[in-house]
Amino acid sequence: MLLEHFGNHPSFMMLGLGNELDAEIDVVREWLDDFRNLDNRHLYCFGSNNNLGWKGPQDGEDFFVTCRVGGGDGYTTHVRTSFAYVDAEKGGILNNTRPATDKDYSGAIAHCPRPVVGHENCQFQIYPDYSQIEKYTGVLHPYNLEIFRDRLKENHLSSQAKTFHQATGHFSIECYKADMEYAFRTPGFGGFQLLDLQDYPGQGSALVGILDAFMDSKGIVAPETFYGFCAPLVPLALMKDHCWLNTQPLHIDVALSNYVEGDWNEPVRWSLVSDNGVWKRDGVLMASIPQGKVGKAGSIDLSLSGLKEAQRLTLTLTTGKYRNYYHLWVYPDETAESEGSVHVASFLNDDLRKRLESGASVLLIPDHDSIVAQSVGGMFTPDYWNYSMFKTISENAGKEVSPGTLSILTDPGHLLLKYFPTECHSDWQWWSITRNSRPMILNATRGEYRPLIQVVDNIERNHKLGLVFEFAVGKGKLLVCMIDLQAIAGTPEGNQFRTSLLRYMKSDAFHPTEQLAWKELDALFHTDINQRQIIGVKNESDYTVGGE
């Protein structure tokens, strides 16, 4: 028996009876009672994430491993920030609440009289690197990767495969960091577990690891960077937002999550620097954090009025050998940019055709309800675990299917983004923008055509998706924006994105080279897309329970 043969092993501290069981609680409790009678030195639980957490902690468990601490309103009982759409409204906290770094799970674990361990955090899909196919020289053959690669080729996107991999990989790391730090910020939290650090090529292909299936690095994060937010001691910045106006006072609390072997009494050095290096502030705080505690070291209060142009700032926190970073964006507090000579439209109609034929500059922001069949939903975080599996589960449960996208992809140096600092992939300033969008399916465009701002699709569909794209139509110039600019007008980043877009359209740089006839444009917006049948693998968990 396991307890008899391994009970004395120094690493044997905890035992659970399985993973995501739909267990008969009385039977499992009886088993644990027998185990304790045989060896009471260990900590026992009924299993990991049994009943998907809906039934909450049970008498007889020493600790509780779960994604949620029983049922509750919204996300009040969640101890993980990301879910499948079938399991939490809009995929959970990270996708559906405005990004901030000052929240934690204190409210959720208050419902539990024993330690809570977060279950299978950080399941963010990353687009695959198809060069790994060559590694499969044994009995396993990567038919799945070959199929996905062929689908990409069908839509003339093969040249972007490596870029897709890098962009989605770098964005997934930001989501890893946010998910983990939610746990580290929570006083009294029992910890969290990842499913693994590597891809899981089974169950429909869950490519969610920072390592590939061979345990090789994907090259998306340096070990020292990962260690900065997943270590025995983690410096934490507590901010109410990532996006600020230069008229707002910046307040940041600095905390430490201390799980080293002793108390931590060391200085915390901080620096806040703009990407161009012109604006810089720094300082030192003194930390005194008891072992096993999450405590504040002090705060940072600054004026941002010296930043007259849109800037990304990087905050670095260093104490001893531990270093962590944060990005925030500061935008000038200005009145909304005028449309000027740009004509704004919501539908394709005869008036719009005539304007384009006569040489007008047109901004088309399609009414989202009118293009559902030609687009996919707006989503911020990378799709959870595996699209085909949870698409099927959602449909069978009668619940919303995830939009299934992975990240934006753009050229940060393009003049469209001159006044909206960004990297090539999604980051926190894109949250409201992507959530209020419907990326257009552009498979019917010329094979080599690329949108100005693209969205990386999942491996099952591999659509060419456009968030912002442009065409020359007749004598006119057309820019199509699949983002509801009105919906994001009240946010610092939304107003700034609109400003950058309109300034581009009013400049000489706005000169589309991709010619499209009106008939082709009309077909793009009114032809239903032939969708590939996607059948997910069977999963035994019951996603029809719960209240979300």
Annotate the PLM regions.
Residues A88-K103, I371, K391-P492, A509-G547:
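Catalytic beta-strand/loop cores that center a nucleophilic Ser/Cys/Thr
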Residues G340-S388, K475-K477, C481, L501:
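Short alpha-beta junction capping motif
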Residues Y326-L348:
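Low-complexity, Pro/Ser/Thr- and charge-rich linker/hinge segments at domain boundaries
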Residues G320-Y325:
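Short, exposed coil/turn segments at beta-strand boundaries within extracellular/luminal domains
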Residues Q248-S288, A297-S303, A310-T319:
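Beta-strand-rich binding/interaction modules
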Residues E24-V27, W54-K55, I365, S370-V376, ...:
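Extracytoplasmic/secreted cell-surface and envelope-processing proteins
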Residues M1-I210:
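Substrate-binding/catalytic cleft of secreted carbohydrate-active enzymes
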Residues L38, L195-Y259, E266-V268, I529-R532:
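Aromatic-rich peripheral "rim/lid" segments of glycoside hydrolase catalytic domains that contact
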